[in-house]
Amino acid sequence: MNFLAHLHLAHLAESSLSGNLLADFVRGNPEENFPPDVVAGIHMHRRIDVLTDNLPEVREAREWFRRETRRVAPITLDVMWDHFLSRHWSQLSPDFPLQEFTCYAREQVMTILPDSPPRFINLNNYLWSEQWLVRYRDMDFIQNVLNGMASRRPRLDALRDSWYDLDAHYDALETRFWQFYPRMMAQASRKAL
């Protein structure tokens, strides 16, 4: 899961959106640096990552990547799941339009920015102003996201080529998304994530 899915599942679970978004920017035990609700959100994010990576649908999808891109498949798939969520948002969350959800999420996250790591602050400078969560629905934007990540982290250069794996298996990936994401939504609503 990437930014949009973590925020969405956090909302469904009535968990801290701030903590769920911040989690990838925090190493180790967050308890000494953040309030309890944010810490709980960080822990939820980490549980979701472990759960998602071990889903049979996700393990199967990783195998569809070519040998030269399989190492970055988990990252690429996380971004792709956000694509499908953004694209099908009106079906999955009909009572909370994506644009409104994005504004709501931004308001929640802004409260912790003054005490956040610089890389997280930098992300927030772009995430909201450039409407990433809405733009995830466009595959051209997904390609830009993968290229941007590869540019910032040269050891992840294979992300550029992983675009072709997504393109080649688009329909099958979408099917897998529909198999697991509604289950995760139900788990979040039951506060079972």
UniProtKB/Swiss-Prot annotation:
| EC id | 3.1.4.14
Q: Name one GO biological process term.
A: fatty acid biosynthetic process
Keyword list, A-Z: Fatty acid biosynthesis, Fatty acid metabolism, Hydrolase, Lipid biosynthesis, Lipid metabolism
Q: Which GO terms describe its molecular function?
A: [acyl-carrier-protein] phosphodiesterase activity
Query: Quick check: keyword ATP-binding in the entry?
Result: no
Q: Which family does it belong to?
A: Belongs to the AcpH family.
Write the protein's name. Acyl carrier protein phosphodiesterase
Q: Tell me if Hydrolase is a UniProt keyword of this record.
A: yes
Give, as one word, the top-level EC class.
Answer: hydrolase
The chemistry this enzyme catalyses reads: holo-[ACP] + H2O = apo-[ACP] + (R)-4'-phosphopantetheine + H(+)
Pfam families on file: ACP_PD
Q: Which gene encodes it?
A: acpH
What this protein is reported to do is described as:
Converts holo-ACP to apo-ACP by hydrolytic cleavage of the phosphopantetheine prosthetic group from ACP.
